[in-house]
């Protein structure tokens, strides 16, 4: 599919009277290609209570996703909530304001006026009696039929029950990448129906694999939500190889509140798989001054985006890590970063930390890269510390030298000044002594 910008639809609750004092606002982003698309609320100012679901590939080859934010119901009439969508591949930016709508149930619905009853009060005419054969008493006239009564008007058509704004919505989620890549785990495709009303709570699911109906799905008990609606989930267990081979899974949902069944289809992203490249990076020298340090795992060049990244040390899982979502690179592949935070003492003790990556394009679907404080890194850190110490000592020496130099210059200048002054004074005194007193000599001659 060629690059296509998304269509954005705001989703609002029925009314301000929601249970629990909170309300859910939604934003549906549909029909875009390729991934990724970013969704924020109020230009990123609103982050609490935001949940953005993973993108889903539709049968049309385009992606769609949704984002939900939970806000206080008291703020719906006073604050503005805007869904900001940014699709960089198509250079599309869309801002949609989510406004509270008045649901159908809050308005007055008038039944159509019943038709006037047809009048059937006049009986049909009595059939004509036969002519008498004699002058005797004629035979009685046949009894006329009873007139049909149409006085009772037909019942007024029943008014439709109020519907929840928008009706039930259906979302289809793929199995977790780790579940599809490990034989010991069970991959599942999940079909979620939300906004199911109390008036029509029954939901029917039908599942199809490559167009063939299957019957091994399990429907979980419905769960009541904070907005007084139900959430119903159906889970279909799939075979590892069926999913990896690109089989298509369809969930068909029926409910009385829907004008027609809703169908959602999902399958593994199509395209040639590309093997990820894995690189591990030690903590930076600047970070070694802190109590905790970060170990980084860069995974790049993989396709499709279904991937799982975990950390472990000495065979035991490490849980204090964060992994970014896969991001689209310029060559059409994906990349991500995973950061593990550990105590600096554990790193300096030489513990080995491993970044484990699972992807369908890898040999045995698995690879691992280890990282530890090697002797080379220890020597480098020691040399860096020694170099820092030498530089500190050198600066101290240079500072002392400059200070002494300036003092010596000042001392030399002062001594020279006094020497010149003394010599000048001596010359003046000597000159006065040598010059003869001609006045005395003239006086003596006279």
Swiss-Prot record:
Provide the record's note on post-translational modification. Answer: N-linked glycans at Asn-322 are noncore fucosylated and the vast majority are diantennary species with a bisecting GlcNAc. Among them the most dominant glycans are HexNAc5Hex4, HexNAc5Hex5, and HexNAc5Hex5Sia1.
Which segments sit on the Extracellular face? Answer: 1-397
Identify the stretch(es) annotated as Hinge.
Answer: 99-160
Positions of region (CH1) = 1-98
Q: What positions does the domain Ig-like occupy?
A: 6-99, 168-267, 276-372
**Topology feature Cytoplasmic, residues:** 419-446
Segments of this protein annotated with the region CH3: 271-376
Gene Ontology CC entries for this record: blood microparticle; extracellular exosome; extracellular region; extracellular space; IgG immunoglobulin complex; immunoglobulin complex, circulating; plasma membrane
Record flagged with keyword Phosphoprotein: no
Q: What is the effect of changing residue 213 to Q?
A: In variant WIS
Q: Which Pfam families match?
A: C1-set
- Which terms does the record give in the GO molecular function aspect? antigen binding; immunoglobulin receptor binding
According to the record, where are the sequence repeats?
116-130, 131-145, 146-160
Q: Which residues cross the membrane?
A: 398-418
Stretches for region CH2 = 161-270
Tell me the keywords, alphabetical order: Adaptive immunity, Cell membrane, Disulfide bond, Glycoprotein, Immunity, Immunoglobulin, Immunoglobulin domain, Membrane, Repeat, Secreted, Transmembrane, Transmembrane helix
Record-linked InterPro entries: Ig-like_dom, Ig-like_dom_sf, Ig-like_fold, Ig/MHC_CS, Ig_C1-set, Immune_Resp_Modulators
Spell out the CDD domains in the cross-references: IgC1_CH1_IgEG (cd21817), IgC1_CH3_IgAGD_CH4_IgAEM (cd05768)
Q: What pairs make up the disulfide bonds? A: 27-83, 191-251, 297-355
Q: Which SUPFAM superfamilies match?
A: Immunoglobulin
GO BP annotation list: adaptive immune response; antibacterial humoral response; B cell receptor signaling pathway; complement activation, classical pathway
Glycan attachment sites? 122, 137, 152, 227, 322
Q: What does this protein do?
A: Constant region of immunoglobulin heavy chains. Immunoglobulins, also known as antibodies, are membrane-bound or secreted glycoproteins produced by B lymphocytes. In the recognition phase of humoral immunity, the membrane-bound immunoglobulins serve as receptors which, upon binding of a specific antigen, trigger the clonal expansion and differentiation of B lymphocytes into immunoglobulins-secreting plasma cells. Secreted immunoglobulins mediate the effector phase of humoral immunity, which results in the elimination of bound antigens.
Subunit and interaction comment: Immunoglobulins are composed of two identical heavy chains and two identical light chains; disulfide-linked.
Task: Name it.
Answer: Immunoglobulin heavy constant gamma 3
Q: Which organism is it from?
A: Homo sapiens
């Amino acid at each position: 599919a060629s690059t296509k910008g998304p269509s954005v639809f705001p989703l609002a609750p029925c009314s301000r009277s929601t249970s629990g004092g909170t309300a859910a606002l939604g934003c549906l982003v549909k029909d875009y290609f390729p991934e990724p698309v970013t969704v924020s609320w109020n230009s990123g100012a609103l982050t609490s209570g935001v949940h953005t679901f993973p993108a889903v590939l539709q049968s049309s080859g385009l992606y769609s996703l949704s984002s939900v934010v939970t806000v206080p119901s008291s703020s719906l009439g006073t604050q503005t909530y805007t869904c900001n969508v940014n699709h960089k591949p198509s250079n599309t930016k869309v801002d949609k304001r989510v406004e509270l709508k008045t649901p159908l149930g809050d308005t007055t619905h008038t039944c159509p006026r019943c038709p006037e009853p047809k009048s059937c009060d006049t009986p049909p005419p009595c059939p004509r009696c036969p002519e008498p054969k004699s002058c005797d008493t004629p035979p009685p006239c046949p009894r006329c039929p009873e007139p049909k009564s149409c006085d009772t008007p037909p019942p007024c058509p029943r008014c439709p029950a109020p519907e929840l704004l928008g009706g039930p919505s259906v979302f289809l989620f793929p199995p977790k990448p780790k579940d599809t890549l490990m034989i010991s785990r069970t991959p599942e495709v999940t079909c979620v129906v939300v906004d199911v009303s109390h008036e029509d709570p029954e939901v029917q699911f039908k599942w199809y694999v490559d167009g063939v109906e299957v019957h091994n799905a399990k429907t979980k008990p419905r769960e009541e939500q904070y907005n007084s609606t139900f959430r119903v989930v159906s889970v279909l267990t799939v075979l590892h190889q069926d999913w990896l081979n690109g089989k298509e899974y369809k969930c068909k949902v029926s409910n009385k509140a829907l004008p027609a069944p809703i169908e959602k289809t999902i399958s593994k992203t199509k395209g040639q798989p590309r093997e990820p490249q894995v690189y591990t990076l030690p903590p930076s020298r600047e970070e070694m001054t802190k109590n905790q340090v970060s170990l980084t795992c860069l995974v790049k060049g993989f396709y499709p985006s279904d991937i799982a990244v975990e950390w472990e040390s000495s065979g035991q899982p490490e849980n204090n890590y964060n992994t970014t979502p896969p991001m689209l690179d310029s060559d059409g592949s994906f990349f991500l970063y995973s950061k593990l935070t550990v105590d600096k003492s554990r790193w300096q003790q030489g513990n080995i930390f491993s970044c484990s990556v699972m992807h369908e394009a890898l040999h045995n679907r698995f690879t691992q890269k280890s990282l530890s404080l090697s002797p080379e890194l220890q020597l480098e850190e020691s040399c860096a510390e020694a170099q820092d110490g030498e530089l500190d000592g050198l600066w101290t020496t240079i500072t002392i030298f400059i200070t002494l130099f300036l003092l010596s210059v000042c001392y030399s200048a002062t001594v020279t000044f006094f020497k010149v002054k003394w010599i000048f004074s001596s010359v003046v005194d000597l000159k006065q002594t040598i010059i003869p007193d001609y006045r005395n000599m003239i006086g003596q001659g006279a």
